[in-house]
Amino acid sequence: MNRKTYWKDVRKSFSSSKGRVVSIASLMALGSFALVGLKVTPPDMQHTGTSYFTKHQTADLTVTGSYGLNQSDQDLLNQVSSEANIEYGYFKDVVLKDSTDAFRLFSKPKDISTYEVVKGKLPSKQGEIALSSVYQDKYKIGDKISFSEKEGDNGKDVLKEHTFTITGFVQSSEILSSVDLGSSTAGSGELKGYAVVPESSFDSDVYMIARLAYKDVRTANPYTQDYTDKVSKHEDELEKLVKDQPANRLKELKADPQAEIDQQTSQLQTAETELNKKLEQAKASGQDKNPLVQGQLTQAQDEIAEKKEQIKEAQEKLDSIAEPSYDVYTRREARWSEGYVSYETNASVFQNLSNIFPVILYFIAALVTFVTMGRFVEEERIKAGTFKA
């Protein structure tokens, strides 16, 4: 009878402990799922990013110049064309009409840093535009959108028109964030959106950006140290390549205006010499006291003095022109890189969490198991004493 009661009690102990078993198993499973999920997430994010950048041939390096990129700049950069595919383009920061919202308008690329079309199509002719996809709830295809722009240093607008017809909505392969798009030289100073227009919409003698996609890292994982090291090496090479270009470009910029000033100075000196001769002749002949002759000579002297002042101002203005600057950016350093950096950082955060969070869950599960088993043993010890008695 006692044996029967004993086994009945054992079965009852197991059945009454189902909740404890399920709780411990759930905690262990949660730790396992967290471990697997967090370990898998960073590689998946990196794979997704790599596939996206490869599909759109996102530029590994970009080069910009404060005075744009003229033919001599292009000839210099084309020296690395055997190592990289190079594409030149335009961009301009503008302000959405009747607001302070800054937009960056890019020229439509051919092959490098292309766009993902979310809805509609890319612009194909002048006067058309595709907006960033975050604006598809505010605008629809076929709507008109207008911008205003600040004049360039030459007093001219860079854009041929400022009102466009929306043809679609896109996502950039360079600007990954939809919230923090970086700073802007227009409007409030904070970039609110971007758009792409045909290259023919720009009216500029120089390109504004060069994009380089290197062949040795074309399909590489951009989140690896190998990719970083290779791109860093290419960046150093480009910086050395453009090191002397600021002085050369400044000399180039000043050449024609300086030649014009020198020519005008020479002509002025000739005119001044002729005037002095006429003045001496007038004095010799006594005509210098003639009111009419005096008036003509005085007018000529005033004109020469005015011309001298104009030449002086032109020379001072020319001398004040600063050397242009050239900037070489990686994907992480570009002025619109916030989204890229955030994506990379998030992948790294998940990687770090995968090394910590599951351990905490396993520790909690072990602690709960220890406490539960301790109580269970204590209960069974009491029952064992009862049976023994």
Where are the predicted features?
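Membrane transport/envelope proteins' first extracytoplasmic loop
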Residues: 3-363
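Interfacial "coupling" helices/loops that link adjacent transmembrane helices in transporter permeases
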Residues: 9, 17, 367-389
